[in-house]
């Protein structure tokens, strides 16, 4: 289920509303097919370098083989290094060394279930998250995302600020409705920065102390707006130097960037390159 920005539609806090921290991880749906546990991205790409996670979920799927878990591959200690998680989980033929590194750094954080087939519970969110909390064991690699009930816009704002202070990228507001396998107003993003995709069409070298590294990408959005977009958090001097050395691997690629807001003229305030959009 994809989320709309919270600003798109007013929230009725007289209804049951729940809030979770928004993770800056990699979407992961895990299910069991014919006794084989598989994990997928939101576009259906299989994640193959998370055997440690699937092993820990074996007992759960032995008991609930028809349940589909929804969450993210994430590690809060790597919250400023999104690229590291991607580089680990996207391996299609991981070496033993890469499997070991993934087992040390990659966790599954569950925030919902897509299907509760065969389980006698209702489909409202409060019932789904209650099932998760009661049925999913907390192990080394399995985490349950904290979920709180909020009763007002002020309460939501206070909790959102707490999530930001804890290092999360924002918050998610959920209505107490059934799961929707599409972008839905049942799920709202509550964050200060927005994500968007654009195409890398050029670049500028770094200057001064950043000489010999990438200064910024030149990107073009789907409306034809061009803008400079320097790499954001998580990229060190060595990373920026490697980007410049391999710049032709980036030109023409779709990429995700973050920005604070758009001006009346349509330009982006504080755009930052996040990652290439080639991992799903």
Q: At which residue positions do the language-model features occur?
A:
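N-terminal, charged amphipathic alpha-helical interaction modules
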Residues: 142-144
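Covalent nucleotidyltransferase
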Residues: 11-138, 279
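Classical nucleotidyltransferase
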Residues: 18-20, 26-71, 180-280
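Amphipathic alpha-helical
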Residues: 146-194
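Short Pro/Gly-enriched beta-strand edge/turn motifs at strand-loop
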Residues: 2-3, 8-15, 198-203
């Amino acid at each position: 289920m994809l989320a709309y920005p919270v600003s798109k539609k007013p929230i009725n806090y007289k209804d049951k509303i729940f809030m979770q921290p928004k993770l800056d991880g990699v979407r992961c749906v895990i299910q069991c097919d014919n006794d084989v546990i598989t994990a997928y991205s939101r576009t259906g790409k299989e994640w193959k370098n998370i055997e440690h996670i699937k092993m820990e979920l074996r007992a759960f799927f032995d008991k609930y083989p028809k349940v589909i878990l929804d969450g993210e591959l994430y590690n809060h200690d790597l919250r400023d290094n999104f690229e590291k998680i991607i580089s680990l989980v996207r391996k299609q033929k991981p070496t033993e060394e890469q499997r070991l590194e993934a087992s040390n750094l990659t966790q599954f954080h569950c925030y919902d279930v897509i299907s509760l087939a065969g389980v006698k519970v209702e489909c409202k969110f409060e019932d789904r998250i209650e099932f998760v909390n009661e049925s999913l064991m907390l192990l080394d690699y399995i985490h349950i995302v904290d979920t709180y009930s909020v009763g007002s816009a002020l309460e939501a704002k206070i909790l959102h600020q707490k999530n930001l202070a804890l290092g999360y990228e924002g918050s998610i507001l959920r209505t107490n409705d059934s799961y929707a396998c599409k972008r839905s107003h049942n799920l709202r993003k509550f964050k200060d920065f927005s994500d968007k995709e654009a195409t890398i069409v050029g670049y500028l070298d770094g200057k001064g102390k950043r000489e010999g590294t990438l200064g910024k990408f030149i990107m073009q959005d789907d409306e034809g707006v061009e803008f400079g977009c320097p790499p954001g958090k998580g990229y060190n001097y060595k990373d920026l130097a490697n980007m410049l050395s391999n710049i032709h691997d980036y030109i023409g690629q779709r990429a995700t960037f973050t920005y604070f807001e758009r001006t009346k003229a349509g330009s982006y305030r504080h755009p930052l390159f996040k990652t290439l959009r080639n991992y799903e």
